[in-house]
Amino acid sequence: MPTLLPAELELWQSVESEIKKILSSYAYQEIRTPLLERTELFQRTIGEQTDVVSKEMYSFLDRKDQSLSLRPEATAGVIRAGIEHGLFYNQTQKFWSMGPMYRYERPQKGRYRQFHQVNMEAFGYEGPGIDAELIIMTSRIWKNLDIDAIQLELNSLGTSKSRKNYRATLVEYFKDHIDSLDEDSLLRLEKNPMRILDSKNQEMSALIDSAPKMNDHLDQESRDHFNDLLERLDSHGINYRLNQRLVRGLDYYTGPVSYTHLRAHETPEHRGRRRLLEKKKGGGGGGGGGGGG
């Protein structure tokens, strides 16, 4: 977990200031949530079978034997706060937050167990306009920070119904090739089969490339939504690459998902729509999108 020294903080503060100006220009408001939340919040919203919850969270029991966890991401806490304070009922909201997150991962270049993230969330908005806004806004951030060696990848996970149908098709496909799956993929097969598509095992690359494609299982609503998003990005000159193997490791993603990385190797930003999350927490307010980096 890194320490930020005075000389480094000057650069950090400059970057943060530039980001805040752009977020403010799009009418996003700051929200601050606790570093600690009840573990069950992340289990319900992120998904108990995800790698984040099952392997990567820092969790402990307090003096009342209540399980608490350091936040591994920001969205769950923002949703909880919005529902508890009635911020989503019959209204739209745009929030941003900034701060440290924690995951017990293997430390490596560019990846730390404490990492800092900027999070943008929009609630109560329907249609692809809000997805386009988040991507265009993020593109402005990269441009203003003089970061241009980046690659934006896009995919659509569709509605919760189309995702469920695709999941069943995927399980059937991989069961027919079960002898070719590695240990991690065998564990994911029943619990989170879409994560197999994200495997870095080169020996499984051909098998994954031949797997059923999500695009072939999208309903018409999802197809229209995604195509509209692409047209909006094209009109704003946003470059992207379609990646049908792109999935997110958290259960609450539906609709368009994106993954932005430096062409070298790092991953500064990812985003996706989170319709399922409010349902799991019991809140209303329609669709929404969000991103963090």
Regions found by a protein language model. Give the residues of each.
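TRNA-recognition modules of translation machinery and tRNA-sensing kinases, especially anticodon-binding
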Residues: 1-263, 280-282, 293
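Single conserved hydrophobic/aromatic residue that forms the stacking wall/gate
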Residues: 261, 268-293
